Regions:
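Metal-dependent nuclease catalytic cores that hydrolyze phosphodiester bonds in DNA/RNA
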Residues: 1-119, 211
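Nucleic-acid nuclease catalytic cores
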Residues: 109-202, 206-209
Length: 211
């Protein structure tokens, strides 16, 4: 499971188009640089720290998707420590579902925009307490604004397919005790969609310049 091929998105005409995450990747992330510098000053090996937490996050994320897809993934490549911590993360997600009616319509669904020329694979689109909700599951130490730009990209894909989004939601699931379970939702992604479209335009302009 550790080696996952990079998803390539092509239009019906065979044109390779960017993913939502590639488009969002245009943004500079100074907070990550500051965070890495802080760890370095504390004598922490940033690469090992990130790799360990990334593995926990990857497994926890997969467990959540498997829950909705009613399937099981073989995690034997991962250490017991990683799996145990990921299971704790998954349990915190299950706790969140207890007070809500969560009904998936699409899980881990890939879509391509023939109109705007980009693709993406979103985590969850379905009903949460009766509202059509787009959810992205994150595992990290906070919720950042660009996560909603990412949701906006997925929202554009869904709307092109004739599916409306009433609410966008980010669930940040903790991997370790120093992180918190966080939920943020928005009733409109209109501003975020404008930003995403600007980023998409920049992506294509840069691609032209670079040839």
């Amino acid at each position: 499971m550790k080696e996952k091929a990079h998803q390539v998105y092509r239009t019906r005409g065979g044109v390779v188009v960017p993913s939502v995450t590639q488009v969002i990747g245009i943004l500079n992330k100074p907070l990550l640089v500051n965070w890495a510098n802080k760890l370095g000053l504390q004598g922490i090996d940033v690469r090992k720290y990130v790799d360990n937490k990334a593995e926990i996050g990857t497994v926890a994320h997969r467990m959540i998707l498997d829950y909705f897809l009613d399937q099981e993934t073989d995690f034997s490549e991962y250490s017991k420590e990683v799996i145990d911590k990921a299971e704790n993360s998954f349990l915190s997600f299950l706790e969140w579902t207890k007070d809500r009616e969560v009904k998936p319509l699409f899980v881990e669904k890939s879509m391509i925009s023939e109109v705007e020329s980009f693709g993406g694979t979103f985590d969850f689109y379905g009903l949460v307490d009766g509202e059509k909700t787009l959810i992205d599951f994150k595992t990290g130490n906070g919720i950042y604004q660009e996560y909603f730009y990412q949701l906006a990209g997925y929202s554009i894909l869904l709307e092109e397919a004739g599916l409306n989004v009433r609410k966008g939601m980010i669930l940040n699931i903790p991997r370790t005790e120093d992180e918190r379970f966080l939920v943020q939702s928005v009733d409109s992604l209109e501003r975020e969609k404008k930003i995403f479209r600007h980023l998409l335009s920049i992506y294509w302009l840069e691609r032209e310049v670079k040839g």
